[in-house]
Curated annotation (Swiss-Prot):
Belongs to the TRAFAC class TrmE-Era-EngA-EngB-Septin-like GTPase superfamily. EngB GTPase family. It comes from the Bacteria. GO terms for cellular component: cytosol. Keywords: Cell cycle, Cell division, GTP-binding, Magnesium, Metal-binding, Nucleotide-binding, Septation. It comes from Legionella pneumophila (strain Lens). Necessary for normal cell division and for the maintenance of normal septation. Residues 25-199 form the EngB-type G domain. Its cofactor is Mg(2+). The keyword Ion transport does not apply. This is Probable GTP-binding protein EngB. PANTHER family: ENGB-TYPE G DOMAIN-CONTAINING PROTEIN, MSS1/TRME-RELATED GTP-BINDING PROTEIN.
């Protein structure tokens, strides 16, 4: 599949709850991560569109489930960022409930791209999200973002650490380094997405 197919992503809709999402059919791949993990930047990098997902200096800005259409059957899903301290507790709990509901109930979900800051991987909520996915045998591809902030050896060690942590689930969990700034890791991410979307 040509790399530029992801650049055809267009905004489809926003949903506050799972029951507001489009019909549960086709293929969806969800992007999730802590509020400061660089999720919007990664989506913009993948699609080569700096305006696709709104980036903000204020973590926790994405409070809705945002869907982007690749074609009639395939969608990218930007899930609300989680774990930001300045968000009210009831809002946090609502987000987490929506995340859990989406991951457990959405039958067209083919995989989860989970973003973690390479300097601070494996936070509690990250692990909870992976466990939710593994509970329903959903593949997870972990992007260790902001790899440009560390040396190559530090990045390599971080990737190894996360791989070892999930080695018992290696049939479902894969890990790579990623930098939106340098566009490092984009092709590896695309190869995972291509497989999940079953592009012919």
């Amino acid at each position: 599949m040509p790399i530029n197919l992801y650049s055809k992503a267009v905004f489809l809709k926003s949903a506050a709850r799972v029951n507001q999402l489009p019909e549960d059919s086709g293929y969806e791949v969800a992007f999730a991560g802590r509020s400061n993990a660089g999720k919007s930047s990664a989506l913009n990098c993948l699609t080569n569109n700096k305006n696709l997902a709104r980036t903000s200096k204020t973590p926790g800005r994405t409070q809705l489930i945002n869907l982007f259409s690749l074609d009639e059957q395939r969608r990218l899903v930007d899930l609300p960022g989680y774990g930001y301290a300045k968000v009210a507790m009831e809002v946090k709990l609502e987000w987490q409930k929506n995340l859990a509901h989406y991951l457990e109930a959405r039958q067209c979900l083919r995989g989860l791209i989970l973003l973690m800051d390479v300097r601070h991987p494996l936070k509690d909520l990250d692990q909870i999200l992976v466990n939710w996915a593994l509970h329903r045998e959903l593949p997870v591809h972990i992007l260790l973002t902001k790899a440009d902030k560390l040396s190559r050896s530090e990045v390599k060690n971080a990737v190894l650490k996360v791989r070892q942590y999930y080695e018992l689930a290696e049939h479902l969990v894969s890990v790579q380094a990623f930098s939106s700034v340098k566009k490092d890791g984009v092709e590896e991410l695309i190869s995972v997405l291509d497989r999940w979307y079953e592009w012919n």
